[in-house]
C-alpha cells in the first residue's frame, strides 16, 4: 500500500519498480538504495537458495522498515502488514522458510501484543528488533516487558543495527555501514549486559547481527572498564560482561577467518549461527563459505555454525529441516 496515503504523512520507505526485477527503495522523494526482486519474491529467493546450497532461510524485515519514528499506532499497523505478508511466504514454503517478525518497539504494550501474535498465530520463531528505539538503548525500563514476553513465549530476539550513531560524521566512504553498524551493535550488547536484562531473564534467547559488531573485539577494554569504574559501569548490574559470554548468540558474518576463529574461541561454535545478510552487498555471497574455510574447525563445530546453533536459537526441533 501507499504508506504516505495510508497514514497521512511521509517518511516511510516505498518501492519504485523502474525496470523488470529491480526497484528503487525511496523515502518520500529521496533515493535510499536499489534492490533486486530477491527482496520481495519468494520464488527468486528459492532459486538463489538452490543455487547456493541453502536448505532453509530465515526471513525478516529490512531494518529501514522498522519505522519506530512514526506514530505508535501506525508503526503497529505497518508491523502487522509486514508480518502478515512474511507469514504468507512462510506458509507457502514451510520447509524452506522460517519467519522473524517486526514489532512496534516505540509502543512496548503494542509490541508485546504483536510479539504474542507473531508466535501464537503466525507461527514465527521470534522477532527482529533494532539496536535502539528512537535513542532509547535496549536496557530502557520501558522496553523490558518486550524481552520478558519473548522469554515467556520462548521466542528468539535478533538484534540488528539501524539508524546508526554518529551519522552526521559518516556521510562519506559508506562509513555508516562499515563503522557505524559494528559500533551500534556493540552499544546494544553492552546495554543488554550492563542493564541486567540477561540477569533478570536468564532464559531469554537473544542474538546479535554481524558477529556482535565491535563488542567481541573490545571485550577486554569493556571488562577492564567495568572493573576500574564500577561507579559508572556497574550501576544497574554487578555482574561483569565477561560472565555473559556464551549466554547470547552471534552470527558468523565477520568476513575474515581470523575474526571468526576469535569468535569461536571467545563464545564457542555453539553460540555462533550462520549469518548471510542476504541479499545485500555486505552479505556473504556464498553463504557458509567462511565457516567451511576454517580447516582446523572440528566437524561438530562446523555443523553447529552451519545449522545447529540456528536451530537452538530459533527454538526449532533439531534436525527438522535435514533431508
Language model features: what each stretch is:
Residues 1, 160, 210:
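Histidine-centered divalent metal-coordination motifs
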Residues 1-37, 164-185, 222-245:
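Active-site gating loops and adjacent loop-to-helix segments of metal-dependent hydrolytic enzymes
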Residues 36-40, 67, 105-111, 134-141, ...:
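Acidic-and-aromatic substrate-binding clefts and catalytic sites of carbohydrate-active enzymes
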Residues 68, 167-174, 212-227, 260-267, ...:
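Histidine/acidic-residue-rich catalytic or RNA/ligand-binding cores of hydrolases
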